[in-house]
Amino acid sequence: MEKKSIQEDFRNYLAQSQREKDFCYFSGKMETISVNHPRSIWNQKANAKLISANEDVNRGFVFSGRFETANQAAQISYEASQKIHNALKWLIHKQGIPIGDKILIAWGVDGSNQEDMFGSTDVFLGKDEDEGEKEAVADTQVEFAQRLKKAIYGKEQDLGHNEKIAFLVLEAATTGRLSVSYYQEYGFIQYAQLMKTVERWHFAHSWKYDWYDARKGVWKSRIMAPSIFDIAEFAEGVERDVKGGKVKGDGKKKKIESNEKILGNTIVRLLPCVLEGRAVPEDISRKLLAKACHPLCYSEANWNKLLKITCSVIRTKYKEVGSMEINKDSIDIPYNYGRWLACAHEIERRALRSASEKRETNAMRLFTKYAEHPNKYMAIVQSKIQVYETKLGQKAYWLQNEKYRISQQLNQNPLEKLVAARHLDGRMILGFEAQMETFQKKEEKEAAAGGEANERIEEQN
């Protein structure tokens, strides 16, 4: 109670000591108007202000349009300004989601304890009846914001909430100005559509992802949509070495680095794809596809992740061949060219592994050229893997048969189309990835069968 009394006394003191009152655009009341609004809303951009005017400094040099003074554009009372900025600062600290050089805030704006923003502090912050005189806790839907963060970053589909929700993205356009680069509000009716839209994103862009659990020492996999952060990072970034770092099976650890501002801009462009159901911008899809066709520019782990992200993004564009399962009946030219290259890669990979050699396969070395001129480089790749087919012997028969069946699918197309094929699109990547996933499943079954056989032998002994 003493704390509240001090706050009231301070507000009364300010009201008496400050200048004459005017109409506040926020509260709709005659109150003392604020001239200098707070800064340091966001720690990373400490000097940036959301509301500011420097007319006295640049008078005569800045075109102000129909306004002669800053107050004609908008005038906000001191109390409203303090409440707005402190609430925003608190929201950023409590449930902000960093996206590059920007910050995303999601919060509930229509809870029962937020009926009057300019009422008492208890009404504004929301008081927990069970806590009596304890510090008030605002109902800004923290749990929802956390679930949204997981949804946006590709980890969860069900947000499970029924309140009115707002989304806000802030960025510092300059060192002194903070701007709103994205804002969207969902009421009770729109919320149900929002949930369907987010779920649709996760369903439409899901793919199988593999990662290594260093703590348990095992590989894990899960079908999920990629995070928009990963999409933006791989679309805009380049691979760099991590000093002193190592990753299993790859020697030096590699990471993807990108310009913070470009990364943030791309993530903001992807937000409507998750929240509003828009298609992924075509230029982002093209960047991912172009980079996926350069496997030698990445470590094996990063390229595999890039490949899966690319498939997740482009699969909605090529629905006939966009499944994670192989479409064996398809005679699509780019799709089957991709499948054929996967077979060539697998044959050489198995031969190199049996000989304890570790180097890139010819399929990987010629991947980029193959995508540009598939008919020409198909013959070149075939000539280079013949020796490995011979080395594998009977072990390569099923792979050779698969490669032969794919060739038969290709031959159902007119010869002139096969010869004229150039610069294969995303269907090649989808075909390659689907075929490699089939090989991985078969390899896992073989490993499991081998382990069971060894266990039976040990039991017999």
Where are these regions (language model features)?
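Short amphipathic alpha-helical segments and helix-helix/interface helices
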Residues: 11-15
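Short metal-coordination and nucleic-acid-contact micro-motifs, chiefly zinc-binding Cys/His arrays
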Residues: 16-22
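Short Cys/His-rich metal-coordination motifs, predominantly Zn2+-binding knuckles/fingers
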Residues: 27-29
